[in-house]
Amino acid sequence: MTMHQDHGVMKDLVKHPNEFPYLLQLAATTYGSPAAPIPKEPDRAFCYNTLHTVSKGFPRFVMRLPQELQDPICIFYLLLRALDTVEDDMNLKSETKISLLRVFHEHCSDRNWSMKSDYGIYADLMERFPLVVSVLEKLPPATQQTFRENVKYMGNGMADFIDKQILTVDEYDLYCHYVAGSCGIAVTKVIVQFNLATPEADSYDFSNSLGLLLQKANIITDYNEDINEEPRPRMFWPQEIWGKYAEKLADFNEPENIDTAVKCLNHMVTDAMRHIEPSLKGMVYFTDKTVFRALALLLVTAFGHLSTLYNNPNVFKEKVRQRKGRIARLVMSSRNVPGLFRTCLKLANNFESRCKQETANDPTVAMTIKRLQSIQATCRDGLAKYDTPSGLKSFCAAPTPTK
């Protein structure tokens, strides 16, 4: 943590002192044990060092997983990060990108392929890609097949959208499915392969929904960064939504348009919220407590992040983030099934109160409240089923669901 970040956390704690115990608890669970050493094998060492280089938060997520899942998820992340680097590199011509994306899965079986790249911190990943392939080939054959099939599917989906403006919400859903939902499906399949969840977890509805929830939260967050991308913007907000509020998406950059910009933002958040309920319902199938807690972290922080983005004009000026203390509170309150339902119920209740106080005249507030009430009902049903004296209140694994 930099001095600037440390100062920001301290300022937040002065305003929200009740979050301090949760920060301590999270620090104890995250940093209380010695950090996992970097592997001695050169290929695995490269992969874990690269993971720490290209991502701030994901290494902590990987380290929270059972040991047998850490290599597979680390490698899968790097495969997709390499694919994403091709998609995002604005120095590549469209035809070059499309061609490379459609055959990238073939390079995941080729220890001799690499690519020169000037794309910042990802250059080393692309230039030493054979080391990633080397570790991939040490994974169980079924896991390798799942990952290569997903890279092929995702790469072709990305290629379809390289020169395509996202016009409709259906196209927006499809793009997010290709780049995130399909990833969730592959990860869940591997978790089931390792017997860390019941077969019911391998559900398109759950895995795709959690992926779409995470991706849409990122797309909303990245408005200011993406609209100012050089040499040209690349935006993913669907025209079917933003076209109701402006003639051009860039109009939201203008201070005089901030009121309509925030209305559009609230519409985007409301759209993303429809993926929370199916994500919640699928969580009960993850019977390994470590896997459950890692996925619950993703779900509650995404829900909390949407509530931070909602009605927040700063989205159009900067990258809006949640307070670290708030994240700690959400994570530490969601370590088992009842805790997850209670946390999401509280988030939904607070969100609904804000809607009634802050955005009563917003054009999409009725739909926002309807979706929040549906989430509330799911949480209450979950608590009625799982928050019993039979031991589910303890810090146990997610229960094996009963039919």
Swiss-Prot record:
Record's GO cellular component, any one?
Answer: endoplasmic reticulum membrane
Enzyme class name: transferase
Which sites bind Mg(2+)? D84, E87, D88
The record's CDD domains line, in alphabetical order, gives:
Trans_IPPS_HH (cd00683)
List the catalytic activities from the record: 2 (2E,6E)-farnesyl diphosphate = presqualene diphosphate + diphosphate
Q: Per the UniProt record, which residue ranges are transmembrane?
A: none
SUPFAM superfamilies (alphabetical): Terpenoid synthases
Instruction: Identify a single GO molecular function assigned to this protein.
Output: squalene synthase [NAD(P)H] activity
Keywords, comma-separated and alphabetical: Magnesium, Metal-binding, Transferase
* Cofactor requirements of the protein: Mg(2+)
A biological process term (GO) from this entry: farnesyl diphosphate metabolic process
The family database entries (InterPro entries) matched by this protein are listed as:
Isoprenoid_synthase_dom_sf (IPR008949), Squ/phyt_synthse (IPR002060), Squal_synth-like (IPR006449), Trans_IPPS_euk-type (IPR044844), Trans_IPPS_HH (IPR033904)
Record-listed E.C. numbers:
2.5.1.103
Disulphide linkage map: none
Q: What does this protein do?
A: Catalyzes the biosynthesis of presqualene diphosphate (PSPP). Works in combination with SSL-2 or SSL-3 to produce respectively squalene or botryococcene. In most other species, farnesyl diphosphate (FPP) is converted into squalene in a two-step reaction by a single enzyme.
Protein family (similarity comment): Belongs to the phytoene/squalene synthase family.
Q: What is this protein called?
A: Presqualene diphosphate synthase
Origin species, per record, is Botryococcus braunii
At the highest ranks, the source species' classification is:
Eukaryota, Viridiplantae, Chlorophyta, core chlorophytes, Trebouxiophyceae
